[in-house]
Amino acid sequence: MIKPNYDWQLLTGFSDEHFIKLAKKEGLDPVAAKLLYERGIHSQEELHSFIQPSLEDLHDPYLLHDMDKAVERIRRAIEDYEQILIYGDYDADGMTSASILKETLEEMGAEVQVYLPNRFTDGYGPNQSVYKYFIEQQGISLIVTVDNGVAGHEAIAYAQEMGVDVVVTDHHSMQETLPNAYAIVHPEHPEGNYPFKHLAGCGVAFKLACALLETVHADLLDLVAIGTIADMVSMTDENRVMVKYGLSLLKQTERAGLQELMKIAGIDMDSLDEETVGFQLAPRLNALGRLDDPNPAIELLTGFDDEEAHQIALMIDSKNLERKEVVQAIYDEAKTMLRRDRPLQVLAKEGWNPGVLGIVAGRLLEELHQPVVVLSIENGKAKGSARSVEAVDIFKALFIAFGGHAGAAGMTLAIDKLEELAQTLVDYIIENNLDVSSKSSLVLDEELDLEELTLDTLKSFEKLAPYGMDNKKPVFYLKNFQVESVRTMGQNNAHLKVRITKGAAGFDVVAFGKGNLALEFSQAKGLELAVTLSVNQWNGNTSLQLMLVDARVNGVQLYNIRGKQHPIPADVPILDINHPVTSESAIVLATLPEDISSLRNYFQEKEFEAIYFKNEIAKPYYLDGYGSRDQFAKLYKTIYQFDEFDVRYKLKDLAGYLKIKDSLLVKMIQIFQELEFVTITDGVMRVNKEAQKREISESQIYQELKQTVMQQELMALGTVQEIYERLCGQN
């Protein structure tokens, strides 16, 4: 059945004609104008700044706390030919952050090395053993962290004790106690007053680069765009400026590694946007850090050797494929371990790759709609990630170590605490009366009419991009349309393309992961969709297509699966009239009881969200009918000629002569017997020639047969709506 994944909330409209006129000057249609107005943009100045952001809108990097100290120390290191280590992170934000600073320092003539920690051997953030190696073996005298550092107390204290200064540049959550670093550059530093708090790690690195070079180094913005999009920070203020310029730069990038990676990924650079980066580029970079040594990414992003770039890009793409396989394997295994009796899941196993557990937890959350904790067991510890529904803040649990935000967490705990963790979470949910089954909200920005939808509508909304956190891609509400066709597509027919029409207007809706619902989308009445707008380019033609976000059905869902071509859905229970279900929202009406009227009481007492009508009939009387007046007359006339007739041995001959099916003939003879037209003794039938004249309709057997035939005809040949109305007593 079609079940919505979200709780839909349609925004109310507004009627500010003045703002609509202002928006029109910027090339926006009224629908786009309404969306911006509801997102807090009301003046012409705000509107112009949003639609046409400028590099002049970037804030002064020296407003960041300790920026002056960081610049002074790095410049001194360059002047004194000190060895500088850039210490990054193993994700796309960390990779781009390190690459930005590497190119900046090399441009300034610095002696610089870059190291990205290995997730499995070094862990996240400053690692004392790594610091020790670079200090003792490589002669490093200045360490600059990017996208990490504010939690690296021990490693930074060690470096400072060894006479090596550490400049921290980071954007992660500040702790109460900060490390004793030479400088800490952070947009949320408690002693700072930076006007925008939501920079990614690469954004902070870029601000440092601008301060060092004393100019806005726009050539680095392609890397800033990748890291900012990948880290899913707020797409507002200067992040919006940097990403918009960076995406333009990416479309014409001269970076050999990015060119090769995009070529291998099949990315059309002309149509590249924030979704291309978020769903195709960033996952490939992240896959490297999730599974292996992330350091080759630095050469990919900054190198000039085309052949080496090609080889690294191939390797990264293969890691991404491997990542998908690992995720699928863990996901499949985790599903076999689910505890259906709990309002949450805590799943742990040896051998699971901790680098992908967040992805697995997210997939399980999407399917189960309840908090999920997925952990890998190694050396007596369980380490992994959690994903949670809106109703439950996972931080309320007790962890040895944790990180993340409300709804997502990373943690490490002793394996003997696993059951305690699960019980703690269960108790928290029960004690706080939390509804874990409640769906997350989906804001629908506007109801659209298919007949008013054009490519110009899409172009208007493209001006609002790049989309992301705090500037989400608009989601539109569609209803009152017809489904013209549905077809599966993709590997294993995993996806759908649904053609919807209204009047002369028609558009394709692409529904990823809905291939198993082809029948439902083709038959559902009252179908309503939540979609985003997208462009489809094929064979030189450009058209508007819709991308499905969610779907629901207004009213009960009735599906016709009669006939051999429609299998019974594996995940929907079959109705057993003798053991009726009480809690299911969907049911399959498979084999019908002989007395179909017995179903009416059941369906009038129970409400279902979806009913699948298979309607298999064990004894299909409807195929033969209930006997016509001529058939009864011909039967009587035939048997009247005989003194007696042995029905045990001559029934088939009689049926053949009368051209009546055996099963119907038996019923007709039973009707004659009931009306006393004949008697039957030991299988021998004799005509009662003194019987009173009576109507066939006086027979109870005839009435029951007629009713059965009519009911079976409805169940076999009627529409599902007619069947439903009859079962529910609506007619």
Describe the predicted segments one by one.
Residues 1-26, 30, 702, 708-711, ...:
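Extreme N-terminal flexible tails
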Residues 2-4, 11-142, 162, 180, ...:
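Hydrophobic helix-and-loop "lid/oligomerization" segment in the mid-to-C-terminal part
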Residues 87, 141-148, 585-592:
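Acidic beta-strand-to-loop metal/phosphate-binding motif
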Residues 89-90, 117-120, 148-149, 171-174, ...:
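Short, ordered loop/turn segments at secondary-structure junctions
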Residues 97-101, 153-162, 171-172, 358-361, ...:
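Short Gly/Thr/Asp-enriched flexible loops that form oxyanion-binding sites at enzyme active sites
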Residues 106, 240-331, 386-400, 406-731:
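Acidic, two-metal ion nucleic-acid-processing modules in DNA metabolism proteins
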Residues 132-202, 206-211, 219, 236:
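Active-site cavity-forming subdomains of large catalytic enzyme subunits
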Residues 180-230, 594-597, 601-605, 609-616, ...:
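Short alpha-helices
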